[in-house]
Every structure is written in structure tokens, then in C-alpha cells.
Swiss-Prot record:
Stretches of the chain found on the membrane's Extracellular side: 78-731
EC identifiers of the protein: 2.4.99.28, 3.4.16.4
Annotated GO CC locations: extracellular region; outer membrane-bounded periplasmic space; plasma membrane
Domain-related comment: Has a penicillin-insensitive transglycosylase/glycosyltransferase (GT) N-terminal domain (formation of linear glycan strands) and a penicillin-sensitive transpeptidase C-terminal domain (cross-linking of the peptide subunits). Transmembrane signal-anchor is required for the synthesis of longer, 20-30 disaccharide units containing, glycan chains.
Name by which UniProt lists this protein: Penicillin-binding protein 2a
Organism: Streptococcus pneumoniae (strain ATCC BAA-255 / R6)
Biotechnology: Transglycosylase/glycosyltransferase (GT) domain of this protein may be an alternative target for the development of new inhibitors of S.pneumoniae as the beta-lactam antibiotics targeted against the transpeptidase domain of this protein have increasing resistance.
Principal place of residence: membrane
Polar residues bias locations: 676-690
Positions of transmembrane segments: 57-77
A GO BP annotation: cell wall organization
Residue numbers spanned by region Transpeptidase: 301-731
């Protein structure tokens, strides 16, 4: 029955009842005196009921409500894209890198997809005889059983045809509710209009769950009997068909007795449906279940090679494009991203070296997050969101690079202190106060061990991360200027107290991704792009359903960006970033630390943010919760610097190698760089040419392994397609 005809019936019935009500109104006016006398003798409740025609009114209201619900469910069915279902079930969601090369896949609830010709006729018949005996005759709905389920408020089982079950498995939850049953009804009608019975049966058998994490008849046949779906015997087919009612309850690995009893019931159904005779039933029922069990299922091949990046892709698809996790994983999408596999692989290999990360006395590793972002487009080229021990476990782990809320420490100074100063016309060598000051109740000093002096030039104040000049600058320019700048650079300043401490990051919460986006403005001539992972998403039919539109926001003038870069070049040559400086590459940027509340000699957060015209690398290090047992010793140069330098040294060779057009502020003022390649290497034994070569080699192996696995899978898929075509020629 077509949906349009259903609504025609609703409307005709509605019109009929309305017409009858109008007729009854005219009739009562013509009643005789005796009729009215009889009416007067009726009880007051019945009299009231009859006088105002409440039966008719309730009936019309009920029909109206039913009509509205029907319209809503009709709209739900029409808005659901059933055209893509077959393609979505056949294919996995694939993730592509920025060069549109396949980088991995999301498996979801998918098994090995096979065509109906590769599924045993015994298995097809067993399923139809048990789940939907009128399958080839009905239009997707068993109306009697469906309305029984509706009357019992969804509590009555067995009301679903194979088509309805396919609709439920593909689009709906497993809840036994009237709403779900009604949606299932309309979706089943839509599926019946779009697909043939053979296509529906094929999709159902490939999308059904068979327990033990196994989906689809092909993988289920291998899991329980060690054969392909085309090779299952009659008794094996009956066992698999019986599992559909309760995959865990009738699972032969969980209970041979329950599974055997259920198998025998299916065999009886097949006799009743005329698919087999009594002798075949008896013979199949005598087969010992345990003798048939043989597991040859190899499990799913994991293509989740870049966990932190793929997690971030899924999170962005959910939060930005309003897709559900289930849709993303199971609908066979093609997700094109900004991923650079060379960046990502090298970053992951660096994080696997746990000796680079501090460890608490109880053995807990400090956590960390790093982002590599292209400053012109905002495309994230690589991200690692957890230390390697945790990064490979599970799906959608917490990502410290994109989801954490940490104090930025001194990395906020270029944003809220020195950018407003440069915009106000301050010269880079302007002398700033560098002596201990008391501002009402707020007293500030430089970080432990850093000397104070009467004055210091602004470029030195930034490079050496001096607190006193930074706070003095905000005091001179006004706290409001600092807040305006922070908001302009994309920081959330709404709940931050308007105090001078904002110059040091007080009250501000951020993460490496957000800071990378902010610093991109310095690398991109004052234009800040929108950080993003996804460039576009296509559905299983190749239609673009979501896409990123590159946008840049002018946050500062190019001249201001150039002057800021000139000062931040000094961070890595003469300032706090010397130990973070990569070999053979020039970077600008800033370091940052946050003092531990219980001891100012320890730190809660350590940051290094560095950039070239081609890439921004933002790195954070710290324990999830800082306390007397979990803290970082020393400053950034003792912790985060080692990880940052390894990342920079391994991914910078893959960048175009663009150079800055501005001169280091130290050099402008006649001061030679303090860092040398020799000094950098002697600060950390892990940073050797052999070590870098090993990291790059292992990273290349990871990329090559991904490429080979994808290539092998495509060859296997293509070979299967060719073979199926050859077989079909002789059918």
C-alpha cells in the first residue's frame, strides 16, 4: 500500500465523520416533542453527552490526532534517504588525507558484505520461514501483526517483517515503543518502493547481528561453522536463522542446548512453509551441534591507524555538521580531511617514546597534546591527543589537543599583552619596567630564578618571558585592551576576571588547537583562519552533504603581525625557547608555564608554540590533575621542550621550507643569537641525528603500511568483484 493512499483514507474518514456530525445537528432540530421528552428522561451525564455530541467530537479529535501523527511519520520517512542504504551497507566510511589518498576507515557494525547469490538457499529459506513467511507476498508490512504491536503499546514482539527489521536496524533504535513501531512502518513502505525483495533480503542478511561482535551472515558463518555463507548446511542455516531472535540467548557458543532447541524450531518452520520435507527436518535435527562448531573468523582489520586524528574528525562531524556517531560510522561516507600522513605518522612515533614524558612516583605518565596546523587555511595537518600508552586504546578517547581546558601561561602574552602594545605604536625596543611591583592587592614577580632589573626592551621581555614588564604593559594600556585582544584571537574571555593577572593567563582556559589557530594570525600576515579537520563529506552515493568553506578573519594588520614575528623569533634564538629550537630551521613562537598552586617551583602546565610561514606547532604537557603527587618539575625547557623539538625536527622537512621576510629583533638591535646546534643537542641526549633518522624511518613505515593495507584491500575487493562477474555469467 502506498503512503499517499493511506493519507487519502485518513482524509476521507475525517470528512465523513465531519459530515455526519453536521447531519446530526440538523436532525436534532427536527426532533418531535416526544423525542425531546424522552431525552429529558435520560440521566444528566448521558443527556449532556448526547446534547453536545461528545462521541463524535472525541472521534474527530482522535482522527485529527492520528492524521497529524501520520503526517509527521510520513515526513520522517520521506526525509530519510533510503536511496543510499544499499551503498552504505556495502561500504565502510573512508577517511582521506589532504591529497585525497585513502588514509583509513571506520568499521562500525559492518561485516563482510556478500550478494544474495553467495548466500546459501537454505539460509535464505530458514530466515524467511522464521522471520517473515509472507515476505515475497507482502508490501513490507504485516498489517495484522503490526496493529497488534500498536495496540499493546509496542510490547508485543513479532510484529515486524524482514523489511521492517531492516528499517529498524538501519535507521532506528531497538526500543519497544509505539513511536518506533510507527516510524518503522512508514520506513518499511519507503524501502519497499525503492528496492526489490532480493535487494531487501540481501541488505537484511548483511546487516543482521549474530552475537559475539559479528555482523552479517558471511562473518557469522565463518565465526560459528568455519565456512562461507554459500556453504552452510541445512542444520547450520537453521542455527544461524534461529539466532536472529536472540543473538546472545541462542548463540551456540553460549548455550548449545538453547541453540539446538531454537534450531529445531526453525526446521519445523521450514517444513510448515514448504521449504523442506519431514525427512530433511529429522536428518538435520539429529546433527550434533558441537561437532559443527569451528571458528575461522579473523575479525575486523583495523584501519584506525591515526587514532587522535580520526577521533577529532568524528568529533567535528558530530559537533559542526550535526551528524550522529552511528551515521558517521555506518553510512559508508567518504570523509576528506586536511590530514598530512607524514606529519601525523612522525608525531605519533614521537609520542610512542615515553621516555620523553615525565612520570609521577606512582607510575602515571604526564598527559600531552600537540597540533600541527597550516596557517593560511587553518587545516589541521596532524594531531596527537594522548601519550602513546593510551592513544591506541578505544574509540573517541579524550583528546588533550582539542578538548582540554588548560591555562595558557605565558603563551598568552603575545596575544593580550604585546599585540596591543605594538598596535598602540610601541617600538620593539621600548624600555619596559622590570622590577617587582604591587598593584593594590596584586603582587607580581618574575618566574623563580629570573632576575629583575630597572628596565628591559620589549623584544627581550617577550623572548625571555618576563612577567613584570608584561603586567606593567597591561596596566599601562588597560585591562580592557587585553580582553579585547583575547576575544579577537578567539579565546573565551567571558568568565575571566578582569584583573591584571590576565597578562599571565590567569583564569583563561584553552587547548593546543585553539592556541594554534590564534598564532596562525602571526604566520599569516594578520589573518586568522578557522581551524578544521574536515574539508568535505560525501555520502555513499558520492553527493556532498557537508563541506568546509575556508574563511579568514583579519585580527591584526600585517605590519603588526610582522613586528610580533620579529620579536618571537628571539624566543628560539635568545629566549626561553632555546632548548626547543629545531635544528636547521628558523621558528618564531613562545613558551609558557603555569606555576603549581602548592609550590611555585613546580608547574602544572608547560607549553611550546612555534611557527614558520608553513606550519604552526602547538604543544602542551601536564598531568590531568595537578597535586603534590602529580606535578611537573622545573620549567618548559626541562619538559615540553624535548617533545616539541622532536616533533618540529621530524615534520619540518615535509613543509615547503618557506622563510620569514622579517628580521629577528635581537639581530636588529645588534645582538647575536645565543643558541647553536651544538648547544641544543647537548641539552637532550635523545635529540641526535640517529634518533631523528629512526623516528622518520618508523614514521615512513607507518605511512607505507597504511598504503599497502589499503592497496591490498582494494585488490582483494576488485578481484572479488571480477570473480563474482565471472560466476554470474554461468548462472
Amino acid at each position: 500500500m502506498k503512503l499517499d493512499k493511506l493519507f487519502e483514507k485518513f482524509l476521507s474518514l475525517f470528512k465523513k465523520e465531519t459530515s455526519e456530525l453536521e447531519d446530526s445537528d440538523s436532525t436534532i432540530l427536527r426532533r418531535s416533542r416526544s423525542d425531546r421528552k424522552k431525552l429529558a428522561q435520560v440521566g444528566p451525564i448521558r443527556k449532556f453527552w448526547r446534547r453536545y455530541h461528545l462521541t463524535k467530537i472525541i472521534l474527530i479529535l482522535g482522527l485529527s490526532a492520528g492524521l497529524l501523527v501520520g503526517i509527521y511519520l510520513f515526513a520522517v520517512a520521506k526525509s530519510t534517504n533510503v536511496n543510499d542504504l544499499q551503498n552504505a551497507l556495502k561500504t565502510r566510511t573512508l577517511i582521506f588525507d589532504r591529497e585525497e589518498k585513502e588514509a583509513g576507515a571506520l568499521s562500525g557494525q559492518k561485516g563482510t558484505y556478500v550478494e544474495l547469490t553467495d548466500i546459501s538457499k537454505n539460509l535464505q529459506n530458514a530466515v524467511i520461514a522464521t522471520e517473515d513467511r509472507s515476505f515475497y507476498k507482502n508490501d513490507g508490512i504485516n498489517y495484522g501483526r503490526f496493529f497488534l504491536a500498536i495496540v499493546t503499546a509496542g510490547r508485543s514482539g513479532g510484529g515486524s517483517t524482514i523489511t521492517q527489521q531492516l528499517a529498524k536496524n538501519a535507521y532506528l533504535s531497538q526500543d519497544q515503543t509505539v513511536e518506533r513501531k510507527a516510524k518503522e512502518f512508514f520506513l518499511a513502505l519507503e524501502l519497499s518502493k525503492k528496492y526489490s525483495k532480493e535487494q531487501i533480503l540481501t541488505m537484511y542478511l548483511n546487516n543482521a547481528y549474530f552475537g559475539n561482535g559479528v555482523w552479517g551472515v558471511e562473518d557469522a558463518s565463518k565465526k560459528y561453522f568455519g565456512v562461507s555463507a554459500s556453504e552452510v548446511s541445512l542444520d547450520q542455516a537453521a542455527t544461524l536463522a534461529g539466532m536472529l531472535k536472540g543473538p546472545e540467548l541462542y548463540n551456540p557458543l553460549n548455550s548449545v542446548e538453547d541453540s539446538t532447541n531454537r534450531r529445531d524450531t526453525v526446521l519445523q518452520n521450514m517444513v510448515a512453509a514448504g521449504y523442506i520435507d519431514k525427512n530433511q527436518e529429522t536428518e538435520a535435527a539429529e546433527v550434533d551441534m558441537t561437532s559443527q562448531l569451528h571458528d575461522k573468523y579473523e575479525g575486523k582489520i583495523s584501519d584506525y591507524r591515526y587514532p587522535s586524528y580520526f577521533d577529532a574528525v568524528v568529533n567535528e562531524a558530530v559537533s559542526k555538521y550535526n551528524l550522529t556517531e552511528e551515521e558517521i560510522v555506518n553510512n559508508g561516507y567518504r570523509i576528506y580531511t586536511e590530514l598530512d600522513q607524514n606529519y601525523q605518522a612522525n608525531m605519533q612515533i614521537v609520542y610512542e617514546n615515553t621516555s620523553l614524558f615525565p612520570r609521577a612516583e606512582d607510575g602515571t605518565f604526564a598527559q600531552s597534546g600537540s597540533v600541527a596546523l597550516e596557517p593560511k587555511t587553518g587545516g589541521v595537518r596532524g594531531v596527537v591527543g594522548q601519550v602513546a600508552d593510551n592513544d591506541k586504546t578505544g574509540f573517541r578517547n579524550f583528546n588533550y589537543a582539542t578538548q582540554s581546558k588548560r591555562s595558557p601561561g605565558s603563551t598568552i602574552k603575545p596575544l593580550v599583552v604585546y599585540t596591543p602594545a605594538v598596535e598602540a605604536g610601541w617600538a620593539l625596543n621600548k624600555q619596559l619596567d622590570n622590577h617587582t611591583m604591587q598593584y593594590d592587592s596584586y603582587k607580581v614577580d618574575n618566574y623563580a630564578g629570573i632576575k629583575t632589573s630597572r628596565e628591559v626592551p620589549m623584544y627581550q621581555s617577550l623572548a625571555e618571558s618576563l612577567n613584570l614588564p608584561a603586567v606593567a604593559t597591561v596596566n599601562d594600556l588597560g585591562v580592557d585592551k587585553a580582553f579585547e585582544a583575547g576575544e579577537k584571537f578567539g579565546l573565551n574571555m567571558e568568565k575571566v576576571d578582569r584583573v591584571l593577572g590576565v597578562a599571565l593567563g590567569s583564569g583563561v582556559e584553552t587547548n593546543p588547537l585553539q592556541m594554534a589557530q590564534a598564532y596562525a594570525a602571526f604566520a599569516n600576515e594578520g589573518l586568522m583562519p578557522e581551524a578544521h579537520f574536515i574539508s568535505r563529506i560525501e555520502n555513499a552515493s558520492g553527493q556532498v552533504i557537508a563541506s568546509h568553506k575556508n574563511s579568514q578573519k583579519r585580527v591584526i594588520d600585517k605590519s603588526v603581525a610582522d613586528k610580533m614575528t620579529s620579536m618571537m623569533l628571539g624566543t628560539f634564538t635568545n629566549g626561553t625557547g632555546i632548548s626547543s629550537s629545531p635544528a636547521d630551521y628558523v621558528m618564531a613562537g613562545k613558551t609558557g608555564t603555569t606555576e603549581a598552586v602548592f609550590n611555585p617551583e613546580y608547574t602544572s602546565d608547560q607549553w611550546v608554540i612555534g611557527y614558520t610561514p608553513d606550519v604552526v606547532i602547538s604543544h602542551w604537557l601536564g598531568f590531568p590533575t595537578t597535586d603534590e603527587n602529580h606535578y611537573l618539575a622545573g620549567s618548559t625547557s626541562n619538559g615540553a621542550a624535548h617533545v616539541f623539538r622532536n616533533i618540529a625536527n621530524t615534520i619540518l622537512p615535509y613543509t615547503p621550507g618557506s622563510t620569514f621576510t622579517v628580521e629577528n629583533a635581537y639581530k636588529q638591535n645588534g645582538i647575536a643569537p645565543a643558541n647553536t646546534k651544538r648547544q641544543v643537542q647537548t641539552n637532550d641526549n635523545s635529540q641526535t641525528d640517529d634518533n631523528l633518522s629512526d623516528i622518520r624511518g618508523r614514521a615512513q613505515s607507518l605511512v607505507d603500511e597504511a598504503s599497502r593495507a589499503i592497496s591490498d584491500a582494494k585488490i582483494k575487493e576488485k578481484a572479488q568483484t571480477i570473480w563474482d562477474s565471472i560466476v554470474n555469467l554461468f548462472r
